[in-house]
A protein has these predicted regions:
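Active-site metal-binding motif and surrounding structural segment of the metallo-beta-lactamase
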Residues: 26-27, 41-100
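Generic hydrophobic/packing signal
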Residues: 9-15, 44, 61, 81, ...
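Flexible, acidic/histidine-containing loops and adjacent segments that form or flank the divalent-metal
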Residues: 1-3, 81-151
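Solvent-exposed loop/turn segments at secondary-structure junctions
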Residues: 35-38, 67-71, 106-109
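Conserved beta-strand hairpin/beta-sheet module of binuclear metal-dependent hydrolase folds
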Residues: 1-58
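A short acidic (Asp/Glu
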Residues: 17-18, 71-77, 111-115
Length: 151
């Protein structure tokens, strides 16, 4: 199995593509989407390049490490585009997100730290929840980690 980590230009944020699998059948995981503007400037063109002439590219997983704008904004832009395409009835969607992981540990255990919360970040997280197209499985990072270790 081959692993390649590709860092896209994301200014002060993070936007990574993890390619894994066998040559000719590699799969892709998107980790964070960078700040505003990165989706149109870096992420979308790269996804289109990977898609090539195929009608759709599968993103095995989209991971939002945390809700700071420099990590989540590009993901919000991606899912907004998918939602718009879906609402127009255009099929297939250009990208198929199989699973969306969002780190929501504090929410799961009922704890919040208002001092650590950024208003813009909270708005981005709410926007992500509001625009996720139908058919995308959402799991929290904690749930996935616990399931993986057999808890």
């Amino acid at each position: 199995m081959i692993f390649t980590l590709e860092a896209l230009q994301a200014d002060q944020g993070d936007c990574l593509l993890l390619h894994y699998g066998q040559p000719g059948g590699a799969r892709v995981i998107l980790i964070d989407g960078g700040p505003g503007g990165i989706y149109n400037r870096s992420l979308k063109p790269r996804l289109e390049e990977l898609r090539g002439r195929q009608s759709q590219i599968a993103l095995e997983m989209v991971i939002v490490s945390h809700i700071d704008d420099d990590h989540i904004h590009g993901i919000v832009d991606l899912v907004k585009q998918l939602k718009t395409v879906q609402e127009k009835g255009q099929t297939p969607l250009p990208y198929r997100i199989r699973t969306l992981w969002h780190n929501s540990f504090d929410k799961l255990i009922g704890r919040s730290n208002p001092a650590a919360r950024n208003e813009g970040s909270g708005a981005s997280a709410a926007a992500l929840d509001a625009v996720v197209p139908a058919g995308i499985e959402r799991e929290s990072t904690l749930h996935v980690v616990l399931r993986c270790v057999g808890c």
